[in-house]
Amino acid sequence: MNEIISNHTLDALGLRCPEPVMMVRKQIRHMQDGEVLLIIADDPATTRDIPSFCQFMDHTLLNSETESLPFKYWVKKGL
């Protein structure tokens, strides 16, 4: 797979639910449609919460790496 270029990075390491998703929501509000946010997290709940957030808020989860820590998610603002 080609490398995904991110416009922004969010470090959520050490944070626990619901903080990572709250931070993602705040960051995405300040982004333009089509920009990509790289989220780095280690909370196991993010494997469920980030995809659900994207679906509920109409953002695109471009890719995720959740086989080992830290977890990484690439989220594009909008569909």
UniProtKB/Swiss-Prot annotation:
GO terms for molecular function: sulfur carrier activity. The active site is at 17 (cysteine persulfide intermediate). One of its GO terms (biological process) is tRNA wobble position uridine thiolation. It is found in: Cytoplasm. One of its GO terms (cellular component) is cytoplasm. Keywords: Cytoplasm. CDD domains: SirA. Pfam families: TusA. Its main location: cytoplasm. Sulfur carrier protein which probably makes part of a sulfur-relay system. Belongs to the sulfur carrier protein TusA family. This is Sulfur carrier protein TusA.
